[in-house]
Amino acid sequence: MEPGNHTAVTKFILLGLTDDPTLCVIFFVFFLGIYIVTLVGNISIINLVRSCPQLQTPMYMFLSHLAFVDIGYSTSVTPIMLIGFIVHETGLPVHACEAQLCSVVTFGTAECFLLAAMAYDRYVAICSPLLYSTHMSSQICLLLVGASYVGGCVNAWTFTGCLLSLSFCGPNKIDHFFCDFSPLLKLSCSDVSIIGIIPSISAGSIIVVTVFVISVSYIYILITILKMRSTEGRHKAFSTCTSHLTAVTLYYGTITFIYVMPKSSYSTKQNRVVSLFYTVVIPMLNPLIYSLRNRDVKEALRKATLRIYS
């Protein structure tokens, strides 16, 4: 299709999850509730880590940054999705759509790197406890956190750069609830044979590298745990890892489905459902996953609650 024969697109229309008026009301209330829980849960984690002395450790520092990333991730998508339930077929200027994609990819990629850093932290704590203060010094922790955000920005610029190189001169209705790369690619009147592959290679490379770090870390952790003679020691070591493993499984399972698997292997409806899970649901679940099974967090929350009401 030749761009010169069509009017250039100035805004995109998000079709959202549904056009049924009754479902729109139900979804609005439901997802507004999820968003509020997401904000309250993650802000609580950040405040607890900053205010409680017993949580001033690398593990909880990473957890506080994960909470911040989850807030950014959810906020990049949910408010616009909620508007879509009130005003059907939400219109977004092209630059706003590009900015949303950039934000989603930045926070999503940063989460990958933070989860890998948290796995390495658990590896050092369990396999080399005597060297923990050296290997996980404040400088190294800040370096890992900084690298996570930089990695997120670099990957986001890969996606955004590819999007900026495309021309849109025909249909402008995105069959999605946010400006994801794959639905936008379908609307382009440019040759997408190469542009469509680059983001998948970039995202796939990050997933492979971070999964490798997580896998190797947990292989060594498992070997170390199996060598422990104390049943109590094994239980304690396992309990410090189960929350992280749960978060990793949920998150990587969904993003691998979207960004690595061939687009022909799933439908647009499946894409929306899985995208909804990793952009909206998982940011709400993470604070619950890490707090419900963590004695330190529960104790810090109890003390903070007592301080408020005393």
UniProtKB/Swiss-Prot annotation:
Cellular component per GO, a single term: membrane
Keywords from the named record: Cell membrane, Disulfide bond, G-protein coupled receptor, Glycoprotein, Membrane, Olfaction, Receptor, Sensory transduction, Transducer, Transmembrane, Transmembrane helix
Glycosylated position list: N5
Membrane side Cytoplasmic: residue ranges: 47-54, 121-133, 218-237, 293-310
Taxonomic superkingdom: Eukaryota
Gene3D superfamilies (UniProt xref): Rhodopsin 7-helix transmembrane proteins
GO BP of this protein: G protein-coupled receptor signaling pathway; sensory perception of smell
Membrane-related topology note: Multi-pass membrane protein
Record-linked Pfam families: 7tm_4
GO molecular function annotations of the record: G protein-coupled receptor activity; olfactory receptor activity
Subcellular locations according to the entry: Cell membrane
Disulfide bridge map: C97-C189
Stated role: Potential odorant receptor.
Family per similarity comment: Belongs to the G-protein coupled receptor 1 family.
PANTHER family per record: OLFACTORY RECEPTOR
Protein name per the record: Olfactory receptor 5P1
Source organism of this protein record: Mus musculus (Mouse)
